[in-house]
Every structure is written in structure tokens, then in C-alpha cells.
Amino acid sequence: MSVEHDVIQNASSWVRRFAPLIPKNGLVLDLACGSGRHSLLLASMGYEVLAVDQDVRAVDALGNSLISTRELNLEEDEWPLWDCEFSAIVVTNYLYRPHIDQLPQMLQKGCILIYETFAQGNGEFGKPSNPNFLLNSGELLAFASRHDFKVVAFEDIYVEQPKPAMVQRLCAVKGELKQHIPLQFQG
């Protein structure tokens, strides 16, 4: 099997489930992209992706023409992507509260936010355990409400895969979705 196949296989089931809702035109932001597992998954589905992290060498090494990279300190006060607009934003295993309320202004109307990260109680299973990096109960729902997002799906649960953890997951639309939500995605 190829490295590309292995990377895609490691993509989050949450991202896999809701990626088909992303409008086909436009640019998808993979924020805190890490190894590029979601960038590569999205590119394999035909999306153009901007993969952003403090170290993007692993993503660059994938050599996919639909993926462009940008190396950024994600916790700087002034963030150069605030003026950009995306058709979707994907965030997994990353939380920096001072910037979370900036995400909606970077998302085009009718487009998708897919967010999944660790939640309170995760310290029982390992890292992260610092409360600064763990979502409080219902925090992503409160975020969605604060910014008038339509929630497609939300979970605040214990998972066993890829490792035992407490996570919150949100798929939400800014305004009305540009396309019909298929029944399989409706709660």
C-alpha cells in the first residue's frame, strides 16, 4: 500500500462522514493540518485545500497538486488568514480559544465547519490533559449558537478509536447550506 493510502486511512471518521457536504467550488482550509491526513482525504475527493500548520513538511512531502501549504504560527495575535474566505474549514485535535471566534468570518455563507477535538475528561486517558486544550461541556454547541450556525451534527462523547479519548465533534453550516443535506446526514 502507498503512503498516500495509509495517510487517508488515518483520517477521522467524523471528517470522512461530513466532507461530502463541502461545496465543490472554493478552497478548503485544513487548520492545524499535522501530517496532512485530512488535506489528502479532501484532495482525493477533488477539493482544493490550503493546509496550514507551524510545520508543513509532511504535507509538502505528499506532493499533491490540489494541496497548497502555508507555514504559520497558529497562535500569533495577528493572523494573516483572517481576511481569507473558505468554502469549508476542517479542524481536528487542535484548540486555541483566542482565535476560535475568528473562524466564522473566514467561512463563506452556506459553507461548512467540521471541528473535532478533545474534551473535558480526556486527561483520564492521556494527553492532552491541560484544561486549556480541552473543550468544556457543550462548548462547540455554544460556539455554533453564538455565530448563528446551523448544526448538522454534534457529539460530546467517549471514543475508543484511534485511541481512548473524550471528544467533541461539530459539523455546522454558516447560514443555509448551498446544497441540500442528504437524509443520511440529517439527525
Protein language model annotation of sequence segments:
Residues M1-P23:
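S-adenosyl-L-methionine
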Residues N25-G34:
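Conserved class I S-adenosyl-L-methionine
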Residues G36-E76:
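Class I SAM-dependent methyltransferase SAM/SAH-binding core
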Residues W79-A88:
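A short acidic, Gly/Pro-enriched loop at the edge of an enzyme's catalytic core
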Residues L95-L107:
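A short, conserved alpha-helix within the catalytic core of class I
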Residues C111-N122:
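Conserved beta-strand signature within the Rossmann-like core of class I S-adenosyl-L-methionine
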Residues N132-D148:
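Short alpha-helix
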Residues V159-G187:
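Core SAM-dependent methyltransferase catalytic element
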